[in-house]
Amino acid sequence: MASLLLAAFFVVVATDARPTPHPLDLVARAFDARDRYANFPTYDQLPLHPSFPTKAAWGVWGASDEFGALNHITRATRLAARSEIQTGRAISLNLALGVPDPPINPQRPPLIHAIQPFAGYQDDILTLNTQISTQFDGLRHFPYSTNFEQSTYQFYNDLITFDDIVAPGGTSTLGIQNAAQKGIAGRGVLLDWGGWKDAMNETYDAFSTIIIPTTELDAVARWQGLDPAAFTVPGDFLVVRTGFMKQYTALSAHAQAVLPFREGAAVQWVGVEASDATLRWLWDKKVALVGADNPTFESAPLSGVIDGAVRNLHMVFIGGWGQSIVEFMDLDELAATCHALKRFHFFFTLQNLNVVGGIASPPNAMAIL
């Protein structure tokens, strides 16, 4: 009986993360699925309350929403994306589960794959950190914080606290089961920044801080024959190829082994700029998901000035907008195919693990052209 009472206590505490009344109760948009963009705020109108974190979209989809940017996905967007399937060619966007090896983040242990034989059959046993390879970042992964102090964590819609994740009997709120049950499918669009640089005979080091601004992403769109003002529609999945994995794959085994052990300011790689310009550009496009072939979508070190504050895209995307990120995508075959077909839109699917209360997952992502 005592254990049952203790479990009940933890559940009650964990589900009462927000104070009452909460500013969200005052400013949350009355979201109507029949007209999901009625009274939709502009980027300049974020956040909806001055007490919310930098450019947070808390309340935009309702005070208790757990889907965030996935609300841009509808039956209509999925149906419209069917027209992108013209050849039937399917391309996996996932690296082998043990790649990179060792993991780029040295705090994450590498994959352990064991075979368990039985009489007449064999099983696998996998022990892995879900973010060592191609990965889908869920909404419990990267909150707002000050100097990464746990006491300052702020998660999407202020629905949970750090203790709700790690304490016994914590909630499943904002877990990756939401994305798994939502059904992530629709139209994808590739911006091949790495190919664009190659076409201009401009060499670059993907393992250095090269910041990709939206002006260059628009230039890539034009180079691909797309209209920068109209190459996306709400609910699209935007994928950027930086060339990071192409350069990584070409390394010697020794160079791959030492790359993760850079420290401090030496931890650098190419990626999208963390700035108001980037966030405004993406907010206006109403994309459901972003992804790239680098470790973080944004450039490293992860830092930029957003609305006058030192922030990064991870904080605003995940903690602010409820927008997941797919990282370490395998995009080289997709890019080659898109260039050959002269088409850069495709049908995109992603089915993450249905782990209740999960933080991240291999994405099992696929493009069908």
What are these regions (language model features)?
Residues M1-P21:
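Fungal secretory targeting signals
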Residues R18-L369:
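Active-/binding-site microenvironments in catalytic and ligand-binding cores
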